[in-house]
Amino acid sequence: GHYAQVRKSGDRYLLYKAADKAKDQTYFLACLNQEQLARIQFPLGGLTKQEVRAIAEENGFINARKHDSQDICFVPDGDYPAFLERYTGKHYPAGDFLDESGRVVGKHRGAVCYTLGQRKGLGLAMGAPVYVCGKDMEKNTVTVGPNEALFSSALRGNNWVWYPFPELTEPVKVTVKTRHSQTEQPGTIYPEADGFARVEFDIPQRAVTRSEEHTSEL
């Protein structure tokens, strides 16, 4: 089960953090809609991991003392590119690393294999540390640059899932996470046309990945 909680307020189902904040998984569940939340139960949501282990041990579960996984549990070897190729049946061709001016500075193993903010595993000797600053999936290019190039003051997106209300109609102060392990950051979310909304951060945020799901506390 997942560490999260669902509560009903009026006619709306709301997604709440788990009692065990260290194990909370609401970041990964933030795209669940009202129909899905109405049919979901999270029996672990009100328990801590220690309490779950104690219950498992009392009932003779052999994995009661199993160490917690520290990464994606279904990719035990940590080779995500190889997993993607096995899972999708696709081959991801090599492409170019570019600097901020668009100059080719090296070759990569496929843009899908990299994440914004990544430093390790690039295989580049640039004279100074560089990080993944952007990706063009159509052109299969990965742009690298200094750490300061990773900061954003806002993000804009569509296909939002609203829990307290059907639609966002006015600006709302929120706290936002753009990564699972991140501490919530203050900001304001503004409605825009055609289902889009824009979040402006009080403080610029590092490595706001375009493809990430973002969760906010309303």
Walk through the language-model features, giving the residues of each:
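Nucleotide-activated chemistry modules centered on ATP-dependent adenylation/adenylyltransferase
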Residues: G1-S216
